[in-house]
Amino acid sequence: MKSVSVIGGGLAGCEAAYVIAESGIHVNLFEMKPGKHSPAHKTDDLCELVCSNSLRSDKLDNAVGLLKEELRRMNSLVMRIADETRVPAGGALAVDRTDFSKRITEELKKHPNIELISREITEIPTEPAVIATGPLTDGALMGNIENLLEDSLHFFDAAAPIVTLESLDMNRISRASRYGRGSDYLNCPMTMREYYDFVRALVSAETAPLHEFETVNVFEGCMPVEVMAKRGDLTLAYGPLKPVGLAECTASDGKKPFAVVQLRQDNSEGTLFNIVGFQTNLRFGEQKRVFGMIPGLANAEYVRYGVMHRNSFLQSPKHLTPFYSLREREDLFFAGQLTGVEGYVESASSGLAAGINLARLVNNRPQIDFTRRTAIGALAHYVSEYNGSSFQPMNANFGIMETLPNAPRDKRRRFEALSQRALQTVDSIAAKLKQQEK
């Protein structure tokens, strides 16, 4: 049996390993845990979600919702397990992060074509491989990648705290989703005075040191709440704390809230909640003090404080093809946030595309280009063909997809039309792959 290596047991690596194994090729899946953990990882399981438990929108008029549906139609392992471990989150797909990781780990361990090897890899493999070691790649392996490619980039990422439901004062909190879409979120309404007092405390709170890193380059999609607050007194009120779509929510003065902090369910039992949009680099003691000013959180018990860590990514447009293979070496693929895709689902998407194409290369079949008509392909073409002045990580969005001729002027209808075309393209690719397997 033919054999390849996949380095890294995150979303991209696990998706790549699964799709390669499903094609009948033996996979050595290398993961450094449990022997070694990165600064952001806490468990020994694969596919650990370190930032949020939300995979974001599940609607087809949203690009990440489209990306999820494309992955489902490509028999994605990550999406199947995400759907099976989902927790209430309104129009979004959120998962029980513990169950999600455990289920992925179990699926891969029992696959007859996958051997899970707990070992840190420091050298670039000489055999066909996917490197999906994630944005925290460092040490000897990162040094060898930089030597091979002669460059890399980095930015900083942050995670939000998680609190226990039983420690919250539910007399100050209401359950509802925005615009009447269920009761999945906990809402902490603030008066104007409470909001401004909170912002003043937040911007003056002490942050944790970043040690050797002097210049902080923060990714907009995971901006620390204290950095947002320093952009202006009303930035949070018009951002993650916007008080819209919550008609039944009232502040302590009996009036419409000036701002609302939302908490999202983090496990299937509904005993843990994360503070939405509150990625942070505050010292742990400062988090307890400042976030304790949020109505209902005065005595909150934190099972995980927010953390901030360095993320690395490659100058992918110089080095990668739209198949995620290295221009300089066709049997070496990269996947995940290391390539410049940003987000859980986006990482899984790159792993799926890289895995499909490595398997096809090993089996002497032509590569599959998902094209910019699909969200999967648009991300692949973005990281491999970006020609602007400053390459930065990118989430799924309709702006990087191929435009639609005679598109509807209404934005929602236009996005839905783009999604329908994308799904037709993905269905055609899936059918072609299935036919070739026979």
Show the residue positions of the predicted features:
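N-terminal FAD cofactor-binding segment of flavoenzymes
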Residues: 18-80, 372-383
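C-terminal auxiliary extensions adjacent to catalytic cores
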Residues: 393-438
